[in-house]
């Protein structure tokens, strides 16, 4: 489904990874590991099509993402360090905007069934990330951690097959981590893919998670 083929990347005359190859199938949850500066964020950005490698390629459904860009981005949801939250909109309006922007790509979920979206689903998504009662607050008046929660709420209304998440658990409490773990498992059980970085321990049962380590 997603393959990284002989990917090499050099930044500031330092090799981050060289001839890196791996394949991710539907229904997999993958954590990219490595020390600070190992290239985790760089790798995720390259896979998301937001950065360039020095050599190698990333393929989606056996086709390079540059040539399959339109189909790839219909399947991809990327959450990076920048939340992409619009400060002039409320938390609720941010989710409504996201839903409207991606309406064509969420007409059906991965099982072919119409998704249950709309007003109620947006309120529920914000409640899931601990923002109940803050739905009508302008995002610019929320803390950085709360803005990140608004961004994470998109996951509850997304039917994108591939989720690429850079440190999604930052500033999330233990209960919030458990909620996200449950969501990740639900997504992969439906045939989705989750590719993430995190400094937090996840899943007592390691069978749920495959790790790829950089900087070895």
From Swiss-Prot:
Domain ABC transporter, first and last residues per copy: 2-215
UniProt EC number: 7.6.2.5
Gene Ontology cellular-component terms listed: plasma membrane
Catalytic activity: heme b(in) + ATP + H2O = heme b(out) + ADP + phosphate + H(+)
Pfam families: ABC_tran
Residue positions binding ATP: 34-41
SUPFAM superfamilies in the record: P-loop containing nucleoside triphosphate hydrolases
Domain of life according to the entry: Bacteria
Cell location: Cell inner membrane
UniProt keyword 4Fe-4S present: no
Sorted UniProt keywords: ATP-binding, Cell inner membrane, Cell membrane, Cytochrome c-type biogenesis, Membrane, Nucleotide-binding, Translocase, Transport
Membrane topology type: Peripheral membrane protein
UniProt-recorded Gene Ontology molecular function terms: ABC-type heme transporter activity; ATP binding; ATP hydrolysis activity
Alphabetical GO biological process terms: cytochrome complex assembly
Broad enzyme group: translocase
Subunit structure as annotated in this protein's UniProt entry: The complex is composed of two ATP-binding proteins (CcmA) and two transmembrane proteins (CcmB).
Similarity comment text for this entry: Belongs to the ABC transporter superfamily. CcmA exporter (TC 3.A.1.107) family.
Function according to Swiss-Prot or TrEMBL: Part of the ABC transporter complex CcmAB involved in the biogenesis of c-type cytochromes; once thought to export heme, this seems not to be the case, but its exact role is uncertain. Responsible for energy coupling to the transport system.
Name this protein carries in UniProt: Cytochrome c biogenesis ATP-binding export protein CcmA
Organism of provenance: Photobacterium profundum (strain SS9)
Gene: ccmA
């Amino acid at each position: 489904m997603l393959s990284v083929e002989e990917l090499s990347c050099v930044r500031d005359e330092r090799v981050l990874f060289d001839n890196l190859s791996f394949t991710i199938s539907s229904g997999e949850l993958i954590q990219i590991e490595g020390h600070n500066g190992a290239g985790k964020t760089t790798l995720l950005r390259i896979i998301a099509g937001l950065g360039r490698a020095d050599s190698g390629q990333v393929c989606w459904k056996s086709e390079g993402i540059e040539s399959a860009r339109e189909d790839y981005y219909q399947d991809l949801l990327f959450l990076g360090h920048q939340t992409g939250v619009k400060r002039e909109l409320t938390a609720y309006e941010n989710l409504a905007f996201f839903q409207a922007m991606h309406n064509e790509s969420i007409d059906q979920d991965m099982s072919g069934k119409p998704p249950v979206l709309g007003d109620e689903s947006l309120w529920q998504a914000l409640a899931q990330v601990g923002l109940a009662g803050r739905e009508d607050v302008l995002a610019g008046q929320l803390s950085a951690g709360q803005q990140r929660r608004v961004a994470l709420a998109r996951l509850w209304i997304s039917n994108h097959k591939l989720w690429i998440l850079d440190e999604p658990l930052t500033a999330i409490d233990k209960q919030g981590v458990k909620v996200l773990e449950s969501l990740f498992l639900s997504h992969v059980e439906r045939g989705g893919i989750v590719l993430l970085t995190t400094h937090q321990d996840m899943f007592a049962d390691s069978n749920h998670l495959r790790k790829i380590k950089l900087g070895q």
